[in-house]
């Protein structure tokens, strides 16, 4: 599985290159036509924002192997029981909302094997809308730990974020804290945990991908 360690996520390079090219062209034109200079400044600022958005910082993952860590930076907007249709079980669901200002690289929540993946083509409702769980475009991983515990992590597309990137595939061995994908321009990650998991976060808590402990498996 691909796992980029570069300071900027590889998916951001085309956007950065495009913005820089436009800024340079406008700067050259701006030497003769002042109006183009101001446009060059705008695209220069846009380049900095894109670099900020696609930043890919290192994270220190907790040592406890039973700890399920946050797959995304953001805020917990849902915490409670939920029946997960792919496993057909009552599980504990934790939803993390990512704004455009959060790091958007997603990380593996627990070490294990990808039993299966799924992709659902759907709408692009605001991810804070309850309907987004069932109607929005989404991609998920069903992961099984060495102890046989199963959990699911789902990338949910949103109103602005319409591009889900997932590097993991069925059969992959995932390592907790490693990068496995991203969602462009803000969205949501849903984590479905075994119901007996000891949850360690609350509604409204801020999470840091790869570091914040969501819960402890039995």
Swiss-Prot record:
It catalyses: a 1,2-diacyl-sn-glycero-3-phospho-L-serine + H(+) = a 1,2-diacyl-sn-glycero-3-phosphoethanolamine + CO2. Pathway: Phospholipid metabolism; phosphatidylethanolamine biosynthesis; phosphatidylethanolamine from CDP-diacylglycerol: step 2/2. The active site is at 187 (schiff-base intermediate with substrate). Its cofactor is pyruvate. GO terms for molecular function: phosphatidylserine decarboxylase activity. Is synthesized initially as an inactive proenzyme. Formation of the active enzyme involves a self-maturation process in which the active site pyruvoyl group is generated from an internal serine residue via an autocatalytic post-translational modification. Two non-identical subunits are generated from the proenzyme in this reaction, and the pyruvate is formed at the N-terminus of the alpha chain, which is derived from the carboxyl end of the proenzyme. Binds 1 pyruvoyl group covalently per subunit. It is a peripheral membrane protein. The record marks 186-187 as: Cleavage (non-hydrolytic). InterPro entries: PS_Dcarbxylase (IPR003817), PSD-A (IPR033175). The modification Pyruvic acid (Ser) is found at residue 187. It is found in: Cell membrane. Its main location: membrane. Keywords: Cell membrane, Decarboxylase, Lipid biosynthesis, Lipid metabolism, Lyase, Membrane, Phospholipid biosynthesis, Phospholipid metabolism, Pyruvate, Zymogen. The keyword Lyase applies. GO terms for biological process: phosphatidylethanolamine biosynthetic process. Its EC number is 4.1.1.65. One of its GO terms (cellular component) is plasma membrane. It holds the Pfam family PS_Dcarbxylase. Heterodimer of a large membrane-associated beta subunit and a small pyruvoyl-containing alpha subunit. PANTHER family: ARCHAETIDYLSERINE DECARBOXYLASE PROENZYME-RELATED (PTHR35809:SF1). Belongs to the phosphatidylserine decarboxylase family. PSD-A subfamily. Catalyzes the formation of phosphatidylethanolamine (PtdEtn) from phosphatidylserine (PtdSer). This is Phosphatidylserine decarboxylase proenzyme. It comes from Geobacter metallireducens (strain ATCC 53774 / DSM 7210 / GS-15). The gene is psd.
């Amino acid at each position: 599985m691909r796992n980029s360690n570069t300071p900027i996520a590889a998916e951001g390079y085309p956007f950065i290159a495009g913005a820089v090219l436009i800024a340079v062209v406008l700067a050259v034109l701006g030497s003769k036509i002042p109006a183009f200079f101001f446009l060059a400044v705008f695209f220069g600022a846009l380049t900095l924002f894109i670099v900020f958005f696609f930043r890919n910082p290192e994270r220190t993952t907790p040592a406890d192997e039973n700890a399920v860590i946050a797959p995304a930076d953001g805020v917990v907007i849902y915490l409670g029981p939920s029946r997960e249709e792919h496993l057909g079980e009552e599980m504990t669901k934790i939803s993390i909302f990512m704004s455009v200002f959060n790091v958007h690289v997603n990380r593996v929540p627990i070490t294990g094997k990808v039993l299966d993946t799924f992709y659902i083509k759907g709408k692009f409702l605001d991810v804070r809308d309850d309907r987004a769980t069932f109607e929005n475009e989404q991609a998920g991983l069903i992961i099984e730990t060495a102890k046989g515990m199963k959990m699911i992590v789902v990338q949910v597309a949103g109103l602005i974020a319409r591009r889900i990137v997932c590097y993991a595939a069925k059969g992959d061995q995932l390592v907790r804290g490693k990068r496995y994908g991203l969602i462009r321009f803000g969205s949501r990650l849903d984590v479905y945990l075994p119901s007996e998991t000891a949850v360690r976060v609350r509604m409204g808590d801020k999470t840091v991908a790869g570091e914040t402990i969501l819960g402890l498996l039995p």
